[in-house]
Structure formats: C-alpha cells, structure tokens
Amino acid sequence: LEKEFERVNDIRDFNQRKVLKAFFDNKVAPEHFYTVSGYGHDDLGREVLDKVFAQVFCAEKALVRIHFASGTHTLACALFGNLKYGDKLLSVAGAPYDTMQEVIGTAGDEETKRSSLIGNGVLYDEVPLVNGMDVDFAKLEEMVDEKTTMVLIQRSKGYSTRKSLSMQTIGRICNIVKAKNPDCICFVDNCYGEFVDKQEPLEAGADLVAGSLIKNPGGGIVEAGGYIAGKELLVERSANRLTAPGIGSEGGAMFNQHRLIFQGLFMAPSIVSE
C-alpha cells in the first residue's frame, strides 16, 4: 500500500500549496475574519473569501455562503438560477441521488413536484448508465443537441453502486457536450469530490461547480453552508436565486463565520487525504 499512500500524500501536498497560495495572493489577514450585520453590505471578509475560493477552484467568481442549507440547496440555486421555462436539463450519469430527484421533479409528492424544475417548465432527460456502472459516451453524444441548455454531472456516486467520475471522465463529458453544443452549460455536482485530485472540474472543462461546506472544503469544522464557483455570469445568476434579483452576491450577513470557513478551507486538503 506504500505507493497508494504516497499518491494520496502527493495530492494532499499539491492541494495544500494551492490553498496557501490563494491565501497569500489575496492577502488574507485578521481583518477578514470579522463580519458585518444587517444587510451584509460591504463585507470585506466575505469578498476575500469568495476570491480565495475562486482561485482555489480556478473560477472567474465564487459564491461562498453559510445561507445554503445543504448541498442539495446549493445545487438547486445553481439549477434554478440558470434554467428557465422551456430550457432543457440533461443528467449525464443516470439518475441523480434522491434529494436531487425531488429538486428536478422526478420524485416526491405533488406539492414537491409543483415547486420542482419540471413543475416550473424545465424539460428533463437523463443518459442511462452502461450496466448501471459507466457513463455511456455514445448515448451522451446522441442525446445532446442545440436544445440542451445544461448538463448535470454528478461527480460522486453518492449512495449508488456506480463509479465516481474521474477528472478524465468529466473532461471527456465536457468535450463531447461542447462539440455538440458550445453554449450548453456543463454543471458539476462537486459534493465529496473536492481535493481528492490535483485538478478540479473547472480545469477539466466544466462551466460551473457547486458543493457543501460541511463536506470536503469545510475541513470537517465548518458548521453550515455551501459554495458555487465558475463563470461569473452563471455564479451571479445563482446568487440571484439564493438572495433576490438586485441583491445577488452583494448582500447577506455571515454571522461571524468567516474565520471558521477560512480555517476549514486551510485544513481541507489534509483532512480529505486522511
């Protein structure tokens, strides 16, 4: 097992250097650990936190907020923020996990479905897995067309028996999608995937990623929240869904959680490697 442990340690060290560089480049200092109350306007710590996450994940912009109730809520904001009536969403690795099925509208009671993407007029389809295990690249190429607005790429296998997606697989998916429709948004559910590799999905061709701070990037100590990162326009649209149009990423008091989130991110590469 020595070679495997060496591989994990190499990934840990690479990602730790990446996080440290983001802290250094953005001049993280004690004044960024404090927050403001009320509307949360002009919160310097929140702005720097967003910039640090954006650099770590190689994004144009990041939205790091404790107001996300869960990973599912974070993903829902990204989906609802970037999809409107008549748009089409395609899940590329079979059905997503249970809570996301309720967000999309393929599961849940009638009231849940009424509030879902499908209930709001978004079209949905999914690419079945090969033998319930692997992405069907040929079928993906067949199903993506000019009407496909967004593809959902669930990186982790969740509670299913399929394989989690490697960076190589995510890159191949994005290449196929962009070749068929350059305007299609490649959105990666990055929950449980942060810092398990030297690359993150945006480096492999994705346009948008989202995840939970109570999982990998929170280092096991962040108490709540999530993040969305990627192209600036897509992130800001997601922010409009989290708060409101006209507020977007400019508002939202952080309740003195900056320091813990900075600390969690600092610890994350080491904690994930363990």
Where are these regions (language model features)?
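Conserved PLP-enzyme active-site core in the AAT-like
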Residues: N9, K18-D25, A29-H32, Q55, ...
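Short, well-structured beta-strand/strand-turn elements
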Residues: E60-H67
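Glycine-rich phosphate-binding segment of PLP-dependent enzymes
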Residues: L1-A59
